[in-house]
Design a protein with these regions (language model features):
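Aromatic "clamp/platform" in nucleotide-sugar-dependent glycosyltransferases that forms part
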Residues: 273
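Short hydrophobic beta-strand element within catalytic cores of glycosyltransferases
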Residues: 290-294
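Conserved donor-binding/catalytic core segment of Leloir-type glycosyltransferases
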Residues: 4, 148, 174, 182-209, ...
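Nucleotide-activated donor-binding/catalytic signature segment of Leloir-type glycosyltransferases, i.e.
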Residues: 233-253
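N-terminal subdomain of nucleotide-sugar transferases
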Residues: 1-43, 48-50, 373-399
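Membrane-proximal helix-turn-helix segments that form the acceptor-binding/catalytic region
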Residues: 103, 129-146
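Carbohydrate-associated surface elements
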Residues: 153, 173
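Conserved acidic donor-binding segment of nucleotide-sugar-dependent glycosyltransferases
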Residues: 309-316, 325-330
Length: 399
């Protein structure tokens, strides 16, 4: 079985690169000839790993569609595959991959990567997204052999848009291995790992430290990541404005540097308004670090598996969670960390996720039964599609 993904393996892209790499790596370990095509590397770009065959588009992408003139030709030149799998929406690369698959009479999948959440649709470029849906995206999604989502919430949002294709709920994978670095001090250190952008709500952690005053005086907030320069400056200005001396900006870290920084953390936090999964939680729990997330992400298991805290998306609740974590004994944090590691081994390993993807591919090719985690569209979904398309053409959406 040959499968071609279009996505990215550039390490600085964070979660999407990590999850795509390990999914493809795992598929190859399962005997699937899984490859990827991606845009050309820019100066300073580093690949997430070297164990997956990579093809490159020859032309540079341009906004807002990330249009690249040679995209279709380069996909065709990569060879003929049994299945084509696009990562993300709103991108020319997805349309190009779908066009090639249709031309060759091959099935294709689309992974929205959280881009079809209502909050993500509404945050910017609403007119462009409305045009994209009306022009062809909704049609492409509804002709996909399967849409891959990471949780039930993401599936619900897709159904609400009128997407009637079968949907496979498969989480992102994380590499299960022993990490050589251990925490070397007794300081409570709250870590954030990921892209710095407005919707990540990193300022909530800064406000939490400010609200706790003397209680947090001996603790530290470690912010690991880069991205939006203006947003990063906003965060740094807030730290100065609030007079905090215990907030550290580490910038983007990779490899050994990232492992050492994460090992120094007592707890990791993901205060985002919404996430379709959130790889920072995977990165923390696999390292036996308890985590904090909001109910905007599908991490009920932090509470049910006693490996962290999932709280409502309010400043008060986020601050209370940080306070609880800070007041938790080292022994209890260690127990929570072990619980998290066992959860990762059981459900989120590269092997487990790759097996599920392979089963979906086999089902699409008529070589297996429909997996229990694949959900067919219902009549109500068709009705939702009809209503959505009507509103879309009447211009009532994204006002």
């Amino acid at each position: 079985m040959k499968v071609l993904h279009f996505g990215t393996l550039v390490a600085s892209q964070g979660g999407p690169a990590m999850s795509t790499y390990w999914a493809l790596y795992g598929l190859r370990q399962q005997g699937v000839d899984a490859e990827i095509i991606m845009f050309p590397l820019r100066e300073g770009d580093v690949l997430r790993g070297e164990e997956v065959p990579v093809h490159y588009v020859q032309s540079v992408p341009h906004t807002p569609l990330a249009y690249a003139s040679s995209c279709k030709r380069d996909i065709q030149n990569a060879g003929v595959f049994d299945i084509y799998h696009a990562q993300g929406v709103w991108l020319w690369s997805t349309y190009a991959l779908v066009d090639v698959a249709k031309k060759l009479g091959k099935p294709y999948l689309i992974t929205p990567r959280g881009m079809l959440y209502p909050q993500d649709i509404a945050k910017h470029n609403k007119g462009f997204k409305k045009l994209s849906l009306k022009w062809r995206l909704l049609d492409d999604l509804n002709h996909a052999a399967c849409v891959h989502v990471t949780c039930k919430d993401e599936m619900m949002h897709c159904r609400n848009l009128g997407i009637t294709s079968p949907m496979a709920i498969i989480p992102n994978p994380v590499e299960i291995k022993d990490y050589p670095y251990k925490k070397e001090d007794n300081k409570f250190r709250l870590g954030y790992l990921g892209r710095l952008s407005l919707r990540k709500n990193v300022e909530a952690l800064i406000y939490a430290f400010a609200d706790m005053g003397e209680m947090a005086a001996d603790a530290e907030l470690l912010i690991i990541g880069g991205g939006d320069d203006k947003y990063e400056q906003f965060l740094k200005d807030k730290v100065l404005e609030l007079g905090l001396k215990n907030v550290v900006f580490a910038g983007f870290l990779n490899g050994e540097e990232k492992d050492k920084a994460l090992a120094s953390c007592s707890v990791l936090a993901m205060p985002s308004e919404f996430e379709n999964l959130g790889n920072v939680i995977l990165e923390g729990l696999v390292r036996r670090i308890p985590c904090i997330a909001t109910t905007g992400a599908p991490w009920e298991e932090l509470n049910t598996e006693h490996c962290g805290w999932q709280v409502p998306y309010t400043q008060k609740d986020i601050t209370d969670a940080v306070r609880k974590a800070m007041c938790t004994s080292t022994e209890e944090l260690s127990l929570m960390g072990e619980n998290g590691r066992r959860l990762m081994e059981r459900k989120y390993s590269v092997e487990a996720v790759a097996k599920d993807l392979k089963v979906v591919y086999q089902w699409i090719l008529g070589k297996g039964e429909k997996p229990e985690f694949v959900y067919e569209g219902k009549k109500s979904d068709v009705n939702a599609k009809t209503a959505f398309v009507k509103e879309l053409h009447q211009g009532k959406l994204f006002v």
